[in-house]
């Protein structure tokens, strides 16, 4: 797996497709595109907490088959990247720097960054620190003001188990690593990888996040001009729909897309993938000012609409926000609140 160095640590990534797609019969959904000219429509997919880039492989293949140059990344402490036990190496802002470091390494001036949960907040950190490097953002399941308490209640017991119960968790990891990957479906392995990995570094990741900011302050989010598609769903206390709706209203060029459930993009991805692909077509079809060109394969730095809902498709104007539901659910008009 290719990688680059960030603060003397290895960060792993994978590239999919781009330009005229060469479709093969390999991949998580039985198809993928493997031609990858670096200059064509780069899209970087960032995983969730303690997960790996494998969670985004099916989506990466689908978007690559539509002519995008898709890159998935394992943030430090995750997947195939280095996993140090030092909690000070982990924070949302540092994760944002790692994504920008990947862009520098690949010589990418601007990219669309899509992140899920931890990855969503990482994208917001990039919008804060390096907005000129973003062509657009796809923010799936952000964790903001309304999800903090549920997140603390969920991850504190996990942190205790990973830290004070490390010997027992190591035994559990060894046992689950004995399960052959070929016996499980793709997302079965993605979930089981949570337990297969060594517990010490995972605990350090959570500790580092607990001691840093979770996302840019809302007063700062109001200033972000990057076009954004915000995905949210109901019945999830860690990623409440209210956070997604709030963020879509805060972002001047934000748009809200309602998912049917937590797993729709993974289990029944066609509708949401179409919406994401249309958003990519939109942002790459309109010119934006670009940052100073990054050197090709340079070493990474060591430094730091909501509009009315109708049965018609969502308008593709970057400055408007729209809520998109399944066709059967598009009968009611939603008045903009706040």
Residue spans for each PLM region:
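Short beta-strand/loop motif that positions the catalytic acidic residue
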Residues: 224, 230-232
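Conserved alpha/beta-hydrolase "acid-adjacent" motif
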Residues: 237-243
């Amino acid at each position: 797996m290719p990688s680059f160095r960030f603060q003397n640590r290895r960060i792993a990534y994978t590239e999919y497709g781009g330009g005229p797609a060469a479709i093969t019969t390999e991949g998580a959904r039985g198809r993928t595109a493997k031609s990858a000219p670096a200059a064509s429509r780069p899209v970087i997919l960032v995983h969730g907490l303690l997960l790996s880039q494998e969670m985004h492989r099916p989506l990466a293949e689908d978007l690559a088959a539509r002519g995008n140059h898709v890159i998935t990344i394992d943030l430090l402490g995750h997947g195939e990247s280095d996993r140090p036990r030092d909690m000070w190496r982990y924070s949302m802002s540092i994760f944002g720097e790692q994504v920008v470091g990947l862009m520098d390494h690949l010589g990418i001036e601007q990219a669309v960054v899509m992140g899920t949960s931890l990855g969503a907040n990482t994208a917001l950190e990039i919008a804060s620190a390096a907005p000129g490097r973003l062509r657009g953002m796809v923010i799936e399941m952000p964790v903001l003001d309304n999800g903090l308490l549920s997140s603390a209640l969920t991850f504190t017991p996990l942190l205790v188990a990973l830290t004070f119960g490390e010997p027992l968790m190591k035994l559990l990891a060894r046992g689950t690593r004995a399960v052959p990957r070929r016996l499980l479906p793709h997302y079965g392995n993605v979930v089981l990888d949570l337990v297969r990995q060594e517990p010490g570094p995972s605990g350090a990741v959570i500790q580092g996040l607990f001691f840093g900011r979770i996302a840019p302050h809302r007063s700062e989010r109001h200033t972000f001009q990057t076009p954004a598609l915000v995905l949210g769903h109901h019945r999830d206390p860690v990623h409440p729909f209210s956070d997604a709706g709030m963020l879509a209203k805060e972002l001047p060029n934000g748009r809200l897309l309602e998912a049917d459930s937590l797993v729709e993009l993974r289990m029944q991805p066609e509708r949401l993938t179409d919406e994401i692909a249309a958003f990519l077509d939109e942002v790459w079809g309109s010119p934006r000012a670009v940052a100073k060109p990054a050197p090709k394969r340079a070493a990474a730095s060591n430094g730091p609409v909501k509009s009315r809902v109708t049965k018609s498709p969502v308008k593709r104007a970057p400055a408007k926000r729209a809520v998109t539901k399944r066709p059967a659910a598009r009968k009611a008009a939603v008045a903009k609140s706040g």
